[in-house]
Regions:
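Membrane-interfacial segments
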Residues: 70, 132-140
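Interfacial loop-to-transmembrane-helix boundary motif in multi-pass membrane proteins
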Residues: 138-154
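Alpha-helical transmembrane segments and their cytosolic membrane-interface
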Residues: 153-189
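Non-cytosolic membrane-interface motifs at loop->transmembrane helix junctions
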Residues: 43-48, 105-116, 174-186
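Hydrophobic alpha-helical transmembrane segments of multi-pass membrane proteins
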Residues: 19-36, 47-71, 75-104, 113-130, ...
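Divalent-metal-activated hydrolytic enzyme cores
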Residues: 13-16
Length: 190
């Protein structure tokens, strides 16, 4: 199934906007590094941030490859491109969390980035399920039931992540901007 000719302009515009978004995220990672002082990061943290930025670049490269598809985009390609955008967002939030770690004045922002990072993991898992289901053309009764379960469980999982903004269920960031797991961390990852 390809995008109809009348929809081609919207497809191209949306896809190009996504590529621009990926470029902005890579630039924002670099700007954040300069702003908060990436030189203060321990070497292992700096390596992690660098890997995140390279990961965003790889997402952009793969996204561009999908954009160059000459025959339009079928459902699996569109879902794959959505996963690339979600992964790039997750990588950006991870890089931001590492760069904000240990800055007391930004502990609230660090908490928000961690919460959004956890939410992005859940959303990425859901998008992966949708991609696999479309790729394998799983339309039988069992797949539909699994899809229903995934959709029903998505809201409570996101709610538990968002609850970390107010109650330290899985983690907390102290006043010094340092991240800590709570006893409920493993449970919050399920």
């Amino acid at each position: 199934m390809t995008v109809a000719d009348g929809e081609r302009w919207n497809w191209e515009w949306n896809a190009k906007a996504g590529l621009l978004f990926l470029g902005v995220m890579a630039a924002a990672s670099a700007i954040l590094g300069v702003t908060v002082g990436a030189e203060r990061l321990p070497p292992a943290w700096a390596l992690n941030v660098g890997e995140d930025v390279v990961g965003i670049a790889v997402c952009a490269l793969l996204y561009y490859g999908c954009l160059c598809e000459k025959q339009g985009a079928d459902e699996t390609t569109r879902l794959f491109m959505a996963m690339l955008l979600a992964e790039a967002i997750k990588l950006f939030l991870d890089a931001a969390s590492w760069m904000l770690e240990g800055i007391p004045a930004l502990h609230g922002l660090n908490t928000v980035t961690y919460v959004l990072f956890l939410c992005s993991i859940i959303l990425l898992g859901y998008q992966f399920w949708r991609y696999i289901r479309a790729y394998l053309a799983m339309n039988d009764a069992f797949a539909r039931r699994c899809d229903r379960v995934m959709r029903v469980m998505l809201a409570p999982a996101l709610a538990l992540c968002l609850a970390n903004l107010f109650v330290p269920l899985g983690f907390y960031v102290d006043e010094q901007g340092v991240y800590y797991n709570t006893d409920g961390y493993l449970l919050s990852m399920i």
